[in-house]
Amino acid sequence: MGFDYFYGQQSQQFAFYRIPRVLFTDNRFRKISTDGKVLYGLLLDRVFLSQENGWVDEEGRVYIIFTLAAIRKAMDCSEKSAIKYLTELEEFGLIERIRQGLGKPSLIYVKNFIDQENLRVMKL
């Protein structure tokens, strides 16, 4: 397969997922798997969409809905792996899942790893 080079402004034509660099460079996040970090980037992308769509709770917190099926498709992984990555992020404190019951998908709150008061990465 022969791929071509990027020329001029062609490199700006694609949409990208953002994964915070600090998840890879700060020792406090070293125990999060690479796939968990990638999932966090996907969840962050959804936060921006949810905010645009007005998915905000009564406390002003943005939430997302990202089903296991959607995670499996986005990450090309099994259900067991998708659950593992979500659980890893939840146990680390980077997300909070609120189960709605009655077959509805969970609400996911993606937490900000920056301590706004001190403008530094929070200690987890």
Where are the predicted features?
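Compositionally biased, low-complexity repeat tracts
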Residues: D4, I32, R97-R99, K123
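Low-complexity, intrinsically disordered short peptide segments enriched in small/polar/basic residues
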Residues: F16, D35, F92, L107, ...
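Winged helix-turn-helix DNA-binding recognition segment
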Residues: R46-V110
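Short recognition helix of helix-turn-helix/winged-helix DNA-binding domains
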Residues: M1-A69, K73
